[in-house]
From Swiss-Prot:
Gene3D superfamilies recorded: Spore Coat Polysaccharide Biosynthesis Protein SpsA, Chain A
Name this polypeptide is given: 3-deoxy-manno-octulosonate cytidylyltransferase 2
The protein's Enzyme Commission number: 2.7.7.38
NCBIfam families documented for this protein: kdsB, PRK05450.1-3, PRK05450.1-5, PRK13368.1
GO MF: 3-deoxy-manno-octulosonate cytidylyltransferase activity
Localisation per UniProt entry: Cytoplasm
Record keyword Cytoplasm present: yes
Gene name in the database record: kdsB2
Record InterPro entries: Cytidylyl_trans, KdsB, Nucleotide-diphossugar_trans
């Protein structure tokens, strides 16, 4: 089982066109993500999967690897499946999917999300993992932009939602966790996932990972020590620059 990291990147964005190429402290956002991920141990290579020549040119300019994918890819997972096919990855190879709008993603998060597959007691009962982070900013608890999640006693996801979950009936004395946009799965599962029709809950919440749960597949959740906020709006860039300048 070899591990490959993919960053799906598209130029079009309704709220922030050209998002992967936006400069953060003078460096394209996609470069921040690529360089941080590349520091992780236990991975073979990092690839940007895109259908856009502008992104390809920038990535190759800073020495990154690019896999061009068809423009009709419907999602990041679909784009990654196409890239993995182009690279002739094996069924048991591990694919890590990192959203390209997380310029503060930590290498430790990459190592954490693949750890369940590398564990000595891994029995193949799950083929997908992801990350959570304990919410410290109370505004994120009620923000639909920040996806919350709950797990069972064994650390497997029960549900992901834009709503506040769990929601205390009478009082609030529990921790809440948000989902981070990092996934790991076998190539075999990625191929299977892309054959499944969109789930009802997935369509309502607009959360692709719910498709796996709706069709009965387990998702192992690992709590990360590092937050990795996403860039969605122009104002987020200033926030990222401030965090980078503060040493994040």
């Amino acid at each position: 089982m070899k591990t490959y990291v993919f960053i799906p990147a598209r130029y079009g964005s309704s709220r922030l066109p050209g998002k992967p190429l936006k400069l953060i402290n003078g460096k394209p956002m996609i470069q921040h993500v690529f360089e941080r991920i590349s520091k992780a141990t236990g991975i073979e290579a990092v690839y940007v999967a895109t259908d856009d020549d502008r992104i390809k040119e920038v990535v190759e300019k800073f020495g990154g690897n690019v896999v061009m994918t068809p423009p009709e890819a419907e999602s990041g997972t679909d784009r990654i499946a196409q890239a993995a096919q182009a690279l002739d990855l094996k069924e048991d190879d591990l694919i890590v999917n990192v959203q390209g709008d997380q310029p503060l993603v930590n290498q430790g998060s990459i190592e954490a999300v693949i750890a369940p597959f590398k564990a000595a007691d891994y029995d193949g009962s799950f083929e997908m993992s992801t990350l959570s982070f304990k919410i410290v900013n109370e505004a994120e608890i009620t923000s639909p932009k920040d996806v919350k999640l709950v797990t069972d006693v064994n650390g497997f996801a029960l549900y992901f939602s834009r709503a506040t979950i769990p929601h205390g009936r009478d009082y609030w004395d529990h921790d809440s966790y948000k989902h981070l946009g990092v996934y790991a799965y076998t190539k075999r599962f990625v191929d299977l996932f892309n054959t499944l029709p969109m789930g009802h809950l997935e369509d309502i919440e607009k959360l692709e990972q719910l498709r796996a749960l709706e069709y009965g597949h387990k998702i192992k959740v690992v709590e990360s020590e590092w937050d990795s906020p996403e860039v969605d709006l122009p104002g987020d860039i200033e926030m990222m620059e401030a965090l980078l300048n503060a040493g994040h």
